[in-house]
Amino acid sequence: MLFASQRIVSPLPGSPANLLSRISLALCMASFAATLAATHAWAADDGEDTARLLSFGGMCLNCELSGRKLPEAKFIGANFAGASMVGSDLHGAAFFGSNFNGADLAKADLHGATLFGSDFTNTDFTEANLSGVRGHGANFFGANLTRTNLDGANLLGSELERVNARDAQFVGATLFGANLTQGHFERASFKAANLVGANLAGASLAGTDFTGANLAHTNIAGVDLTEARGLTQAQIDQACGGPSTRLPAGLVARTCKAGISNVIILHSTSPIHAGAPRFIVDLGVP
């Protein structure tokens, strides 16, 4: 069940308002289905202005929306789990507290999108464009980020555990306090990226480029960095490693004196800013 509107209302179960809402929703379904089908025509006839008006809520499980043009659309508390949006144009879109678990967004264009507090567990972003996205507190657990462009992305406090990010681009990205544990980042580029307080424990980093990256307070304890590129002793001196850290020849890690970082994500209860996180960050001293 899916609907588009400028306002999302959740009446109490069994109330007259709820009954009217169901009737209204049933009546709008047919017209909205036609609206989605005509998305290409909107893009051709009216440019992006019509798509900008769309706000999506409700459920659209396993929907087929590949190739759609929905720039700057808003997804607020929406459930698009399993949806197929291959190659769709979603640049500048806003995702607040929405569920895209297992969705297929391969080759989609999401550059400049906002992904606050949304769930992209096991989502396929293969070769997608996520450059410049704001993904504070977003959950990418197990996502496929193979050859994905995340240059300049702000992923502060995001969950990237067990992702497949081989050959991905994180150039100039902010990954402050992010969890990258057990992820596959072979041949990925973190050039000039901010990895302050990030956790790389158990990550696969063969051929990964860290040239100019900020590794202050980054957890590299037990991490194998022997095949990583661009590392300097100055970077390693700022990171949190130890005897179990494996480094390229000539580099030596030091043991942390305290915890690395705690990033507490508090989600707003405001309907307008639903899913938009605030952060309290406590950095330990290595």
Where on the chain are the PLM-derived regions?
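Tandem repeat scaffolds
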Residues: W42-H267, P271-P286
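Generic hydrophobic-segment detector
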Residues: G14, S21, A33, G47-E48, ...
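A composition/secondary-structure signal for short, hydrophobic, low-basic-content segments
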Residues: L2-F3, L36, L231, T269
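N-terminal secretory signal peptides that target proteins for export/translocation
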Residues: M1-L20
